[in-house]
Amino acid sequence: MEADITNLRNKLKECEDERLKAAQYGLQLLERQTELQSQLDKCHEEMMTTAENYNQEKYALQREVELKSRMLESLSCECEALRQQQKAQLEQLEMQLHRSHRQEVHGLRNKLENLKVELDEARLSEKQLKQKLDHQGELLSHKSEELRLLSEQRALSSVSSELLSLQTELTEAEGVKNALREEVNELQCKQEQLECLNASLLHQVDRLKEEKEEREKEAVSYYNALEKARVENQDLQVQLGHALQQAADPNSKGNSLFAEVEDRRVAMERRLNLMKDKYQSLKKQNAFTRDQMNKMKLQISTLLRMRGSQTEFEQQERLFAMLEQKNGEIKHLLGEINKLEKFKNLYENMESKSSTSDSACALEDSTYYTDLLQLKLDKLNKENESTKGELSIQRMKALFESQRTLDIERKLFANERHLQLSESENLKLRAKLDELKLKYEPEERIEVPVLKRRREVLPLNINTPEETAAASATGEDVSRLPLERKEESCLDNLKDNTVQWKQPASLSPHKSLPLDTQPKKEKCVTLVASPASTEVLHEQSGNTPSSPRLTEESRLPTKVKERKEATSKLEKGASKKSHTIMYVSSKSTPEMQCPQQ
């Protein structure tokens, strides 16, 4: 029992010792935990302070970066402005130098031509003087021979009087012959002088034409610069209006409801005034453009017959544009080919490097991956070849279509040229027919009934636009020509709107006007008595009818007067119908290149 008690007491002591040790260890752990917690708090505070410092530095650096970026933007804007100013000044200097050089060249050309003309005249005068000198020498020799013969005849006293009279007549005839020869030589000299003068005048005409073309180009450049200045002025006016609106911002005023309403009313009034000003300016510009368009129409009416090579010029421009487009595509494809070759070389280098690096590794694993990659590569190569074949087919189709469109365009332009030639020949034949009728047809033939003559139904809107344009073009000065591009576009629109009978319906179905949808009896015009056509031809030629047959229109029957009234009514209707004008840009677009596309 005592042994058990002692054992239990020993165990109790051991347990108490262990409990004391555990308590000591717990106290030590608590102390360490408090120390670690305090260290953690200190670290957290330090981290917060450092984070705040970093954030402040970050914001400061961001502000500095923003300021520097703004400064860079302002500097870049100033640099761009200076570049533009320098560029504009350089362009102005180049233009001035070009003009001065051109003026000097013109002056030198004029001097050279004058010197050439003077040299030709001097050579001609020298040649004429030589001819006169030779002629005078011949005359002198003839006179000396005559004097010698006369002296011999006087010496011979046995000569009869008849022989002397014949000799005197012979000398008189020779004198007349020499006088006629001198007159012929003088006339030849005058003819040569006139030919030389004509050649010099032709050279002057060519030079004046070149100067006129250069002046037209200068006028075009001036007009373009004026349009740019107008656009810039309008932009500046719009910016000024925005600046005034921002200066009168209602947000800077009071917050009351009435003040906001008043501010809005003032802003709307300002906008209304701006819109009125814009409306007035646009109205003036529209009136100016209308006047310009009328002048251009009058000038175009005089230039309609000189428009033979314009279709060829437009076709040449279109072909040049297509050539530039194809050259750009070729350059782009060559660049892509170079890129693909570079990529292929890099890929081969990478494959060689990877093969050398992986050769030292396990060969069994690499064979599987290489086979897999080889299969994928073969598959991709097949797909690439198929896509290349499809691409080549598409390119061939595109080339075929482009060639087809070019052939169609060539046929179209050839047909238009033949149409213009046939129209001009038709007009000439009609003019000749009317002149022959007025010259050789008696007046009694006019009173023959109309049923016995052959009639031909013609649309009366054939000559009305050219008639009105030619009649108005006689009173206008055609010395000033506007822009060439606007002239071409307006000319095309004028022909599309007024001369719809000239173009086939398959090419421009959206522009044809149904002028002949309702045929009437008044539209039948006889080919025998057609005073309206003669008047049209005289108005197109710009000359008033001066023949006595045209002044006696009051003696014609009433049918001719009724036809005149009908033609005047139809002319008014045609002039009212042909008021729609479409403005076409001078740039070559794919829609404008060929209407069949």
Curated annotation (Swiss-Prot):
Residues 550-574 have a biased composition (Basic and acidic residues). One of its GO terms (biological process) is protein localization to kinetochore. Required for the localization of dynein and dynactin to the mitotic kintochore. Dynein is believed to control the initial lateral interaction between the kinetochore and spindle microtubules and to facilitate the subsequent formation of end-on kinetochore-microtubule attachments mediated by the NDC80 complex. Also required for correct spindle orientation. Does not appear to be required for the removal of spindle assembly checkpoint (SAC) proteins from the kinetochore upon bipolar spindle attachment. The modification Phosphoserine is found at residues 508, 547. This is Protein Spindly. Residues 540-549, 583-597 have a biased composition (Polar residues). Keywords: Acetylation, Cell cycle, Cell division, Centromere, Chromosome, Coiled coil, Cytoplasm, Cytoskeleton, Kinetochore, Mitosis, Nucleus, Phosphoprotein, Ubl conjugation. InterPro entries: SPDLY_chordates, Spindly/BICDR_Dynein_Adapter. GO terms for cellular component: centrosome; cytoplasm; nucleus; outer kinetochore; spindle pole. One of its GO terms (molecular function) is enzyme binding. Monoubiquitinated with'Lys-48' linkage. Deubiquitinated by USP45. Its main location: cytoplasm. Residues 1-445 form a coiled coil. Belongs to the Spindly family. Interacts with KNTC1 and ZW10. These interactions appear weak and may be transient or indirect. Interacts with dynein intermediate chain and dynactin (DCTN1). Interacts with the catalytically active form of USP45. Residues 531-597 are annotated as: Disordered.
